[in-house]
């Protein structure tokens, strides 16, 4: 019997791809000889490659008609048995449909963000799990996987890792904490000034250097963090994906909101202190499979064996995007975050 041929579709973004890895690991472990082709955006090819899960990685520019036509033709010629759309958008569901893939698996209407998308699937899965990574695993189960999710192992590219370690050595930095104040939704962000105060406390009490990670369009954040950090002089990092993976992999701890770098740190094996407000950590929080986070009786901190998630009690979950920190983010006090960092760092020593 010929081996199965799967098309896995997850175009972006960083955190969403990370939360798709456990489901695709389960697929790979269930079908070790299968061909798994992963379709993604060019920006995330390195990330997908780092997982070692895909036989081939195809990329498409979703805003380019020529790129769409090319990828649909390639999918048609490849004669896939099954396409699994882990994203649930028109742009992620359409290629396999237009290419005529026989079995197309995706989420039922209640779990997709765009109305009508499931009409393009032959198999519609009603997700019952709380966390998005486990929901993705339900798609893998429908495709025939023996388990919904499995443990993820990714590593930074060796060339980036070597260069980054030399960068740290040249600056006399050994142990450090990464502060990640940015995010696509400012409503999910903790104020940068509080990150600055946290940086000072980490330096004074734990004798650790801080590295402020920020991305495109976030050039205002580092100055605000530095301006509130007294004379601790945190390092600033605004690098490409490969060096970012190295930065996160070697950190003692990563502090940030519900953003891609935080979830990438978890996949790299680094403990995190995650600051949550409008989004629900039970659905979008740090994910370590069977070691997933559970709520403490106070419901203000969520802890697993490696991570601590802080969220104010009685927050109403919302996915409405805003340009200012959600009020629930302002309820998270610096002292509480520092204590969480101290506990995580102590647990590693």
Positions of PLM-derived features:
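Catalytic machinery of carbohydrate-active enzymes
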Residues: 1-349
């Amino acid at each position: 019997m010929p081996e199965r041929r799967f098309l896995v579709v997850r175009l972006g973004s960083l955190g969403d791809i990370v939360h798709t890895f456990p489901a695709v690991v389960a697929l790979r472990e269930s079908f070790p000889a299968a061909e798994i082709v992963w379709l993604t955006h060019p920006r995330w090819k390195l990330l997908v490659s780092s997982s070692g899960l895909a036989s081939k990685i195809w990329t498409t520019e979703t805003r380019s008609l020529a790129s769409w036509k090319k990828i649909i033709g390639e999918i048609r010629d490849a004669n896939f048995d099954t396409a699994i759309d882990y994203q649930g958008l028109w742009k992620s569901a359409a290629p396999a449909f237009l290419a005529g893939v026989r079995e197309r698996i995706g989420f039922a209407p209640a779990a997709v963000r765009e109305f009508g998308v499931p009409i393009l699937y032959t198999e519609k899965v009603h997700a019952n799990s709380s966390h998005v990574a486990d929901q993705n695993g339900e798609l893998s189960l429908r495709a025939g996987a023996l388990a919904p999710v499995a443990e993820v192992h990714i590593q930074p590219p060796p060339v980036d890792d070597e260069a980054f370690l030399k960068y740290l050595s040249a600056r006399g930095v050994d142990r450090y904490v990464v502060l990640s104040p940015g995010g696509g939704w400012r409503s999910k962000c903790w104020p940068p000034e509080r990150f600055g105060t946290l940086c000072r406390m980490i330096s004074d009490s734990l004798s650790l250097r801080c590295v402020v990670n920020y991305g495109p369009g976030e050039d205002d954040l580092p100055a605000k963090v530095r301006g509130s950090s007294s004379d601790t002089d945190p390092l600033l990092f605004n690098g490409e994906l490969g060096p970012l993976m190295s930065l996160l992999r070697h950190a003692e701890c990563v502090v940030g909101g519900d953003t891609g770098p935080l979830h990438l740190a978890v996949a790299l094996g680094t403990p995190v202190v995650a600051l949550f407000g409008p989004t629900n950590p039970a659905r979008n929080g740090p994910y370590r499979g069977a070691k997933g986070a559970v709520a403490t009786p106070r419901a203000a901190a969520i802890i697993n064996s490696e991570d601590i998630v802080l969220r104010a009690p009685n927050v109403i979950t919302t996915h409405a995007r805003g340009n200012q920190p959600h009020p629930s983010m302002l309820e998270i006090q610096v002292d509480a975050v520092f204590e969480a960092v101290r506990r995580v760092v102590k647990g590693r020593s």
